[in-house]
């Protein structure tokens, strides 16, 4: 099982930081971009670089890849997701993989680790929400209203879980500790250990009369709306943390956080790689042969570009500062214009005669379809 191949594709060490991974990705992506590199195999290399970055730029996928290889990164050993079409989910706890001595002793003793005060304040769960952005919204930034359900303190009992006029009492079985002592027979003999109290479920409190609204949980699901200011230059997969916008805490603990994950739609005109933008510019072969000044679309509006005589298909020109804003830094990236020369179809008689005259002047014999033609001279 090779769990270093993705790092090798980007040319980074397995302990590389996210900034190092991103920098390496942009370098390799530009090196093998099919519009800039016409060598055989470049497009396949480009796809491999994209695949590696998609995994290594996501901390959860990267951790799975480091442990299990490509199968782990692709969800072969379980996984999460965005929780369905709503684009919303909570962050669950737990862990996978293979245990060691801790698992063995846990099976004997019913658990392990330090005791936790059941009455101590605990922060609420973090939540995740996916926002879909149009290409231009990601470039220039936008404000979005995000509406989702989260757990808040019950408006009836104020979070106590008890019916109005009553209060939670100290658990009669565990005395408020949340745990009880039990004696078990193990292969090592009879041993005493601590387990979660089966009466209060570890809370240390006992609710005799439960709140009719929350049924004793102290929380209720509430529709919540928050304004998200999306910064200019975000990309697919990047996250924004909104502190205190997650689920309500326990025992007076703070609210969890909301993590907004961005998903950017593709453009029908441009391709984007970080702060750099690529545009394929169709051009008449006469313009390419003679040279011309053309008007090129950019995300910032149309600009003039001088094309020298003799320009070939695949030639690229840089428009400095006409790319996307740099999310971490100042200024914009660049736009690359890739020339695509268009061969005319359905020529009229005057056009045919003009080309035939040019062919004759160039010493090229044009004798019909399937034989050596005008453009063969330039191959």
UniProtKB/Swiss-Prot annotation:
Q: Which UniProt keywords apply?
A: Chaperone, Cytoplasm, DNA replication, Metal-binding, Repeat, Stress response, Zinc, Zinc-finger
Ranges annotated as CR-type zinc finger: 141-223
Does the record's keyword annotation contain Phosphoprotein? no
The entry's free-text remark on the cofactor is: Binds 2 Zn(2+) ions per monomer.
| Cofactor(s) in the UniProt record | Zn(2+)
UniProt repeat feature CXXCXGXG motif, residue ranges: 154-161, 171-178, 197-204, 211-218
What GO annotations for molecular function exist for this entry?
A: ATP binding; heat shock protein binding; unfolded protein binding; zinc ion binding
Tell where it localizes: Cytoplasm
Q: Locate the residues binding Zn(2+) 2.
A: 171, 174, 197, 200
What Pfam families does the annotation carry?
Answer: DnaJ (PF00226), DnaJ_C (PF01556), DnaJ_CXXCXGXG (PF00684)
- Please report the stretch or stretches of sequence annotated as the J domain: 5-69
Q: Where is Zn(2+) 1 bound in this sequence?
A: 154, 157, 211, 214
Any single Gene Ontology cellular-component annotation: cytoplasm
The protein's matches in PROSITE patterns, at most eight in alphabetical order, are given as: DNAJ_1, DNAJ_2, ZF_CR
Question: Mind listing the GO biological process terms from this record?
Answer: chaperone cofactor-dependent protein refolding; DNA replication; protein refolding; response to heat
Source taxon at top rank: Bacteria
Using the UniProt record, give the first listed, main subcellular location. Answer: cytoplasm
Assembly and partners are described as: Homodimer.
Task of the protein: Participates actively in the response to hyperosmotic and heat shock by preventing the aggregation of stress-denatured proteins and by disaggregating proteins, also in an autonomous, DnaK-independent fashion. Unfolded proteins bind initially to DnaJ; upon interaction with the DnaJ-bound protein, DnaK hydrolyzes its bound ATP, resulting in the formation of a stable complex. GrpE releases ADP from DnaK; ATP binding to DnaK triggers the release of the substrate protein, thus completing the reaction cycle.
Q: What is known of its domains?
A: The J domain is necessary and sufficient to stimulate DnaK ATPase activity. Zinc center 1 plays an important role in the autonomous, DnaK-independent chaperone activity of DnaJ. Zinc center 2 is essential for interaction with DnaK and for DnaJ activity.
Instruction: Report the sequence similarity comment from the record.
Output: Belongs to the DnaJ family.
Question: This protein is called what?
Answer: Chaperone protein DnaJ
Q: Which organism is it from?
A: Lactococcus lactis subsp. lactis (strain IL1403) (Streptococcus lactis)
